[in-house]
Amino acid sequence: MSTINTDTNKTMPHISVNAQYIKDLSLENPSAPSSLAALDQRPQIDLSLDINITNLSEENFYEVELNIEAIARNEKYKLFQIELKYAGVFNLINIDSEQHPVLLSVHCPAMIFPFARKIIASCTQDAGFQPLMIDPIDFGALYHKKMSEHQN
């Protein structure tokens, strides 16, 4: 039988997820019911994603917010538009502050993204459409792209 040394765990670097929540959720189905009858072809999906990081008042506590917007269109209609702000509160424990930007921009969003993805899929399905299954996102590539653009 193994035991866990909690004193060692308190000093080990780690990320604690203190909360996850929907900050804002909006779904528009502007052309219903006509748009629901026109689902014989796959719609064009325009997707945008943004990440906002807020340093909270307590030391090493941060809110990481995913802003996801998806607009589905076909030849005739704007089928739906969904906007989701989904956030988590993270505590970076015993982690060097130089590592905070990459952890907050890559690892924390990757932890909460599956939950945001599920919310979007459920909402679009509840609106009468096929669930919108957003492909996995490489937050590391997004971070490196943003950093290279910032340096130029």
Curated annotation (Swiss-Prot):
One GO molecular-function entry: unfolded protein binding
Compartment list: Cytoplasm
Free-text function comment from the UniProt entry: One of the proteins required for the normal export of preproteins out of the cell cytoplasm. It is a molecular chaperone that binds to a subset of precursor proteins, maintaining them in a translocation-competent state. It also specifically binds to its receptor SecA.
Keywords: Chaperone, Cytoplasm, Protein transport, Translocation, Transport
Protein name: Protein-export protein SecB
Family membership noted in the UniProt record: Belongs to the SecB family.
InterPro entries found in the cross-reference section: SecB (IPR003708), SecB-like_sf (IPR035958)
Gene3D superfamilies (UniProt xref): SecB-like (3.10.420.10)
NCBIfam families linked: PRK05751.1-3, secB
Biological process per Gene Ontology, one example term: protein transport
Subunit relationships: Homotetramer, a dimer of dimers. One homotetramer interacts with 1 SecA dimer.
